[in-house]
Structures are given as C-alpha cells and as structure tokens.
Swiss-Prot record:
InterPro entries: TAP42/TAP46-like_sf, TAP46-like
Protein name per Swiss-Prot or TrEMBL: Immunoglobulin-binding protein 1
Comp. bias (Acidic residues): 301-312
Region described as Interaction with PPP2CA: spans on this chain: 98-202
Tissue specificity field: Ubiquitously expressed with highest levels in heart, skeletal muscle and pancreas.
Modifications after synthesis and translation: Phosphorylated. Monoubiquitination by MID1 triggers calpain-mediated cleavage and switches IGBP1 activity from protective to destructive.
Annotated source species: Homo sapiens (Human)
C-alpha cells in the first residue's frame, strides 16, 4: 500500500515542468490577469513549485560547499524554482494583500539571486535587503537631488541588462528544440540551462527594483490614509458645549443682563392705564368737554394780554434807561476822591 502511494506522488521533474508550463501560460494569456482562469493557473503553479521546493530541501540537492561545476547538468534547472515562485507570486491579484504578495515575491527573487551569486553563475551585485534600503533612504533623505552619476550608472546598467536579456533569449530560442527533444549532448544541455539562469538573474533584478518602488508607494499611501483617518476622527467629535465662567455668572446676577429683565407692570395694568387716559388705538383721539375748551381759551387770552403788558413795561423802562445815560455820562457824581 505504501509503495502504491509513493508511485502516485508526483516526482520532482513533473512538479518542475508543470509549474514552468503554467508560468508560461500565465505570461502569454490573453485573458485579464484577474480572471478566474488565470488565477487558478497561478494558484496551481505556486502549489506545485512549493512542493518542488520542499522536495529539493529534503533531497539536499544543492549545497553551498560545492561549486557550480559539481552540479549535474540536468539538475541546474532546479535552481530556477525560487525565481518561478517569485514570478507567479507577482501575478496574484488581490489589492488588499498586494503588499504581502510583493514582499513574498521579493523574498523568492532574493533567494534565487543568492544561490546564483554563491555558485558564481554570473557577475552581479546583490540587491540590498528591505532594512538596509530603509536605512539608506533615511540617511539620504536630506539630499535634495539624487546624484547624477548614480542615475547615469543605473540607466547604463538597465540598458546593458536589456541587451543581455535579448541576446540570451535569442540563443535560448535557437537551442530550445534540440534540448527539449533530447538530441543535444550534455555540454549543450548545460549551456542551455546556464543561459536560463543568467536570463532569470536579469529578470529578478528588474523585478526587485520594480517591487521596491511599488512597496514605497503603497506604504506612503497607507500612511496618508492613516493621517486622513485620524483627522476625520477629530472632526467627527461632538462639538464642545458652551460654558460660562463663574465670574460672568456672578456679574450677571448683580448688574443684570444689560437690559431690564424684570417687568414693572403686568399687561392688564398697562391696558387699564392706557384705557384710563384714552390712549388705546381703538379709542381714537380723546374728546375734551365744553368746560375744558372754555377754560383753555380763557387761559390763552390771559397769557397773551400779560405778554403784551409785559412788553409795554419793558419797552418803557428801556427808553428811560437810555435817556438817563444820555444825561449822566460815565463817572458822573464820583467827585469825592478827586485831588
């Protein structure tokens, strides 16, 4: 029974070839990346490559103590497993887990590049880890402009990688049919897989550079969201209730609110008072009695006569005073103190 189970388990070559084939199908698929068909291939390929990686670890097929020449030509292709894992991880579509997918894909690419660097597959510089990149960014944050020399060197490196990648793809396409059909000798097979390793070194370096840029953008977006959320939470707090200082309360009790706050009479009292004097709107102008008219006329006549008499007397006194001043000049009669 155990022997039958072992026969049913997929072997390492089958896991590797199926995973590689699924990756090729995903890369050339015409359907949207988020479609169900494409995502099923992505998940299935990741599962197969994960099993292949576990099997490689159990078999201890590669060791850092050995050189590249000591690895069998047919086993060189299994060094590509981490690179395939990183490429398929990048194909996952889930916006809420995008940052996790990017970090996991970066780990796979770094694992692949580390193996190739240890075996001296090609001459290249390993990318910095995320912690070193963060420290480097913090140290260089005070620089207003990047170094022109560094920018030029990065551009030149990208151009060189692109040319090398195109050349490798051309050579691989020429050797593919012979190797896969089994007609190539061991030397050609070894050269074919070494070219594959070099090609995926260039791809991994480009992917890591793109991943670092996207991770930076996502983290800045998350930090801005947190800042906006904290600001909105402050704005959504209930308004502060108005408060009155004790001093103002005591002052209002003594001096009042600035206007008569207590009534001096009721509405009924006001109505009776105005009704008594006939000043209500519906009462019209109050009518005076005939006796009152007669008294008012008599008082007016007496006042006019009095004013006329007062005027005559005043005029007479003024004329007498003028005559006296004409006959008595200033200083008249003051003769006692004269020498």
């Amino acid at each position: 029974m155990a022997a039958e189970d072992e026969l049913q388990l997929p072997r390492l070559p089958e896991l590797f070839e199926t995973g590689r084939q699924l990756l090729d199908e995903v890369e050339v698929a015409t359907e949207p990346a988020g479609s169900r068909i494409v995502q099923e291939k992505v998940f299935k390929g990741l599962d197969l490559l994960e099993k292949a990686a576990e099997m490689l670890s159990q078999l201890d097929l590669f060791s850092r103590n050995e050189d590249l020449e000591e690895i069998a030509s047919t086993d060189l292709k299994y060094l590509l497993v981490p690179a395939f894992q990183g490429a398929l991880t990048m194909k996952q579509v889930n916006p809420s887990k995008r940052l996790d997918h990017l970090q996991r894909a970066r780990e796979h690419f770094i694992n692949y590049l580390t193996q190739c660097h240890c075996y001296h597959v090609a001459e290249f510089e390993l990318p910095k880890t995320m912690n070193n990149s963060a420290e480097n960014h913090t140290a260089n944050s005070s620089m207003a402009y990047p170094s022109l020399v560094a920018m030029a060197s990065q551009r030149q490196a990208k151009i060189q990688r692109y040319k090398q990648k195109k050349e490798l793809e051309h050579r691989l396409s020429a050797m593919k049919s012979a190797v896969e059909s089994g007609q190539a000798d061991d030397e050609r097979v070894r050269e074919y897989y070494l070219l594959h390793l070099q090609r995926w070194i260039d791809i991994s370096l480009e992917e890591i550079e793109s991943i670092d840029q996207e991770i930076k953008i996502l983290r800045e977006r998350d930090s801005s969201r947190e800042a906006s959320t904290s600001n909105s939470s402050r704005q959504e707090r209930p308004p502060v209730k108005p408060f009155i200082l004790t001093r103002n309360m005591a002052q209002a009790k003594v001096f009042g609110a600035g206007y008569p706050s207590l009534p001096t009479m009721t509405v009924s009292d006001w109505y009776e008072q105005h009704r008594k004097y006939g000043a209500l709107p519906d009462q019209g102008i109050a009518k005076a009695a005939p006796e009152e008219f007669r008294k008012a006329a008599q008082q007016q006549e007496e006042q006019e006569e009095k004013e006329e008499e007062d005027d005559e007397q005043t005029l007479h006194r003024a004329r007498e005073w003028d005559d006296w001043k004409d006959t008595h000049p200033r200083g008249y009669g003051n003769r006692q103190n004269m020498g």
